């Protein structure tokens, strides 16, 4: 052969194991024909060995067919035992039909046993559903979602440092996006609102420490107010806030409290009163001042301007320390008198504060007989904005007293508290109710930090009940999507926003719908609170707009989820420089970064969204697996567990389930207990199955290779017969033991083909089979079917072209033309994340 190869060139093409084309001399023709016959026969013999024997027409009575008939009867028995109607039917009374399960054996799982054997054992020893009587609320370290350990009050709680998070509106131009029209400002319009009294603003979570709890809540709200996150109520039409005002707030800013004169009467504090006042107040701007029409000062006519004392601010249960303002209907009241001897154009000192400027005279120190009203902003005089405030968009000269804050002096100075800096007064186009819509309480900041408090805001009326709102949906990546968008083999850096929700400003009219109180004062959220379902949607829009600009401007792969940013780049040194530039870019726009939770330098393994992500794989931390195994070991077989506790347990299992060899159908018995709100009891085999899942830990590859194998096996079924056909032309026909629904018969044949042939993919004309959603079937059969068909790909083929359609009707198979398509829905990936 070597000699022949030197003299002549021989080309061998492999087709069905033979030689298709041979170029040789005349003397080699006979030898070539011999080689073709020998090699072809040998390869055909190998094909016959690999091809399933029962699919040959001459081997219908073979051993393979008898084994297939046996497996089919086992599958049919699983279907016919209707688990859903008999053994998993919840019972409302503990009768003879529902007995407490017997004590199972201690958990000694055979780790080497295949998962399929453990699954079959669990279908024999079934878990049980019980009644609604009280049961165990603890499963290891887990407890029911609504039976959690009571919060412990800490009188030494510290209010965390909250900084002013005011992002610059230049971000709209720097980061062009359509999202900004929903964020500048954000709007919140509930259909209907339930208002509550101010006195119930703090939830009685700690009955033994009510006053201390309210005191710390008050400090927390004050800290939020000083950070510019809350409005503070002054009256029905006036609120104050700190920080820099936004553009939409400037048109409603005022420098003092004005009302229009009128003869309208109102009922305040239970008394019918007349709002007409005869005392006039000299305006703070000069008559001939050319800048008196300044955009942030609400000018009112001399003859119609009146200073209106503060109405009740929700603090009538606590008398003020420095005296109270006038009651509208009281006999003896404090009247604010005008002092026309002073001019508002007094000289200004170096700090921008008028020297002994008196626009209003001090209040009389007369005791009142009416109800006391608490006002923290005007304790004994009417104060406007104070020093240190700059007018946005327009410079203010010291001589222009119309824009300079005024304050009282003289007798009232010694009784008034220190003036507040950078305070703005807003008279919006809405009314500010003296009621609340949400309630507050404090808890530990987290399990590792019990020294600082966390404020919990309960606005649940907007997510459930008669006032429930349908909040907009937004794209959130699941595990499958995250695997497909993460780049492979790149160093990564994670960034975390500080106080992310407090970056999102609200429309003032929307803020009036989000009212809270510490029992004395009423506050309204100026920024998005964390207790409203709209806030995550707004934060998603916010970070998505930033992430798109970061990716475009710095040429780096960027992914954002809520307040987390993930940056990836092939060059670690370049990524390190980019991260510093990104932080500087965000900080220049007023967006704060939490450097405690930010990766300082590029790393190859990072923790993101609870997953451990390295260059090529995603996995769950080993500590989490150990905790879950410990919980499963502490399951007591035969005891009833409350459904709320099971709900907590299922949540942990669902998170790790994609990293196991199991499927969601294995958790269906616990889902049945949760849905029907009944007790649940574990069987010994079911507990072993759950433990087996945590032992078969696997890691998921990033950017998995998608293979589209050529289908070689097709299945079809009629109510009485089923068939399996192979692309080689062989087929096998089976008779069912009874008539069932057609989708069940189709699934039986697909499972049988998987057990006996083990193909990489299957053809079926049943959409029920191709979608792999078997929740309506009995649990043990659905679990087995899901486990069998999960690793293979199912293609849908129309019945007209199904190759197995002929054998199921006693006709020959036809593999000449069969158009097929996968029915699995394509995973949605945003355009900017594609191509990585």
Curated annotation (Swiss-Prot):
GO BP, sorted A to Z: DNA replication; reverse transcription
Residue ranges, annotated region (Disordered): 263-417
Comp. bias intervals (Polar residues): 377-400
Superkingdom, taxonomy of origin: Viruses
Region annotation RnaseH domain (RH): where it falls in the sequence: 704-836
Lipid biosynthesis in keyword set: no
Binding sites annotated in the UniProt record for Mg(2+): 496, 563-564
Biased composition regions of type Basic and acidic residues, renumbered to the chain: 285-296, 331-342
Region annotation (Polymerase/reverse transcriptase domain (RT)) ranges: 415-703
E.C. designation(s): 2.7.7.7, 2.7.7.49, 3.1.26.4
Segments forming domain Reverse transcriptase: 424-613
Activity-regulation annotation: Activated by host HSP70 and HSP40 in vitro to be able to bind the epsilon loop of the pgRNA. Because deletion of the RNase H region renders the protein partly chaperone-independent, the chaperones may be needed indirectly to relieve occlusion of the RNA-binding site by this domain.
InterPro entries: DNA/RNA_pol_sf (IPR043502), DNApol_viral_C (IPR001462), DNApol_viral_N (IPR000201), Hepadnavirus_pol/RT (IPR052055), Rev_trsase/Diguanyl_cyclase (IPR043128), RT_dom (IPR000477)
Reactions accelerated catalytically: DNA(n) + a 2'-deoxyribonucleoside 5'-triphosphate = DNA(n+1) + diphosphate; Endonucleolytic cleavage to 5'-phosphomonoester
Domain statement: Terminal protein domain (TP) is hepadnavirus-specific. Spacer domain is highly variable and separates the TP and RT domains. Polymerase/reverse-transcriptase domain (RT) and ribonuclease H domain (RH) are similar to retrovirus reverse transcriptase/RNase H.
Family: Belongs to the hepadnaviridae P protein family.
Role played: Multifunctional enzyme that converts the viral RNA genome into dsDNA in viral cytoplasmic capsids. This enzyme displays a DNA polymerase activity that can copy either DNA or RNA templates, and a ribonuclease H (RNase H) activity that cleaves the RNA strand of RNA-DNA heteroduplexes in a partially processive 3'- to 5'-endonucleasic mode. Neo-synthesized pregenomic RNA (pgRNA) are encapsidated together with the P protein, and reverse-transcribed inside the nucleocapsid.
Protein name: Protein P
Taxonomy of the source species: Viruses, Riboviria, Pararnavirae, Artverviricota, Revtraviricetes
């Amino acid at each position: 052969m070597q000699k022949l190869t030197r003299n002549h060139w021989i080309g061998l093409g492999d087709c069905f194991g033979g030689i298709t084309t041979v170029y040789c001399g005349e003397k080699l023709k006979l030898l070539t024909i011999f080689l073709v016959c020998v090699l072809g026969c040998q390869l055909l013999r190998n094909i016959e060995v690999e091809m399933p024997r029962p699919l040959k027409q001459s081997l219908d009575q073979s051993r393979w067919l008898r084994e297939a008939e046996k497996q089919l009867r086992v599958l049919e028995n699983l279907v016919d035992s209707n688990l859903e109607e008999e053994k998993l039917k919840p019972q409302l009374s503990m009768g003879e039909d529902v007995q407490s399960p017997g004590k199972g054996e201690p958990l000694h799982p055979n780790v080497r046993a295949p998962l399929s054997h453990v699954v079959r054992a669990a279908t024999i020893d079934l878990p049980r559903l019980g009644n609604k009587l009280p049961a165990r609320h603890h499963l290891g370290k887990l407890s029911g979602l609504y039976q959690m350990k009571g919060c412990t009050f800490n009188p030494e709680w510290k209010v965390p440092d909250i900084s002013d998070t005011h992002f610059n509106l230049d971000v709209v131009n720097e980061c062009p996006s359509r999202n900004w029209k929903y964020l500048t400002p954000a709007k919140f319009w509930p259909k209907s609102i339930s208002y509550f009294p101010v006195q119930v603003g703090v939830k009685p979570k700690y009955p033994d420490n009510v006053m201390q709890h309210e005191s710390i809540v008050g400090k927390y709200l004050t800290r939020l107010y000083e950070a510019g996150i809350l409005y503070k109520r002054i009256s029905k039409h006036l609120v104050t806030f700190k920080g820099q005002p936004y553009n939409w707030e400037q048109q409603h800013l005022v420098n003092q409290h004005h009302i229009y004169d009128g003869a309208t009467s109102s009922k305040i504090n239970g008394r019918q009163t007349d709002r007409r006042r005869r005392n006039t107040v000299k305006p703070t701007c000069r008559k001939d001042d050319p800048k008196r029409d300044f955009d942030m000062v609400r000018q009112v006519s001399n003859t119609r301007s009146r200073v209106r004392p503060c109405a009740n601010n929700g603090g009538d249960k606590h008398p003020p320390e420095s005296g109270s303002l006038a009651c509208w209907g009281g006999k003896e009241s404090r009247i604010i008198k005008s002092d026309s001897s002073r001019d508002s154009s007094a000289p200004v000192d170096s700090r921008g504060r008028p020297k002994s400027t008196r626009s209003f005279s001090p209040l009389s120190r007369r005791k009142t007989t009416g109800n006391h009203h608490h006002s923290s902003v005007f304790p004994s005089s009417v104060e406007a904005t104070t020093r240190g405030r700059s007018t946005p968009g327009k410079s203010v000269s010291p001589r222009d007293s119309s824009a300079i804050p005024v304050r009282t002096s003289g007798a009232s100075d010694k009784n008034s508290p220190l003036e507040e800096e950078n305070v703005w007064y807003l008279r919006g186009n809405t009314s500010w109710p003296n009621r609340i819509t949400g309630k507050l309480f404090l808890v530990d900041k987290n399990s590792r930090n019990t020294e600082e408090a966390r404020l919990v805001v309960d606005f649940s009326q907007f997510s459930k009940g008669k006032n429930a709102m349908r909040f907009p949906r937004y794209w959130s990546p699941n595990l499958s999507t995250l695997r497909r968008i993460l780049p492979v083999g790149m160093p990564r850096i994670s960034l975390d926003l500080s106080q992310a929700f407090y970056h999102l400003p609200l429309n003032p009219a929307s803020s009036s719908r989000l009212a809270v109180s510490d029992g004395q004062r009423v506050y309204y959220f100026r920024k998005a609170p964390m207790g409203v379902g709209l806030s995550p949607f707004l934060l998603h829009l916010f970070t998505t707009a930033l992430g798109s600009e970061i990716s475009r401007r710095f040429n780096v792969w960027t992914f954002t989820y809520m307040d987390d940013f993930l940056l990836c780049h092939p060059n670690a040194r370049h990524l390190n420089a980019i991260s510093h530039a990104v932080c500087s870019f965000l900080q220049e726009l007023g967006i704060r970064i939490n450097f405690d939770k930010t990766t300082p330098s590029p790393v190859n393994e990072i923790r993101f969204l609870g997953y451990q992500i390295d260059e090529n794989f995603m996995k769950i931390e080993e500590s989490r697996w150990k905790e879950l195994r410990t919980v499963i070991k502490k399951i007591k077989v035969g005891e009833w567990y409350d459904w709320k506790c099971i709900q907590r347990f299922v949540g942990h299992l669902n998170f790790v389930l994609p990293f196991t060899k199991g499927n969601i159908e294995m958790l269906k018995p616990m889902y049945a207990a949760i849905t029907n709100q009944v007790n649940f009891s574990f069987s010994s085999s079911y507990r072993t199955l759950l433990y087996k899942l945590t032992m078969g830990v696997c890691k998921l590859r990033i950017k998995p290779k998608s293979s589209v194998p050529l289908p070689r096996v097709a299945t079809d079924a009629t109510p009485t017969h089923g068939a399996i056909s192979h692309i080689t032309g062989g087929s096998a026909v089976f008779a069912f033991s009874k008539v069932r629904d057609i989708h069940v018969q189709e699934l039986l044949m697909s499972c049988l083909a998987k057990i006996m042939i083990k193909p990489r993919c299957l053809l079926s004309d049943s959409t029920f089979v191709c979608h792999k959603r078997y929740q309506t079937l009995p649990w043990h059969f659905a679990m087995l079917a899901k486990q069998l068909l999960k690793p293979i790909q199912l293609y849908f083929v129309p019945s007209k072209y199904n190759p197995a359609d002929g054998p199921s009707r006693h006709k020959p198979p036809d593999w000449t033309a069969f158009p097929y398509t996968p029915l699995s829905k394509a995973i949605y990936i945003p355009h900017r994340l594609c191509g990585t």
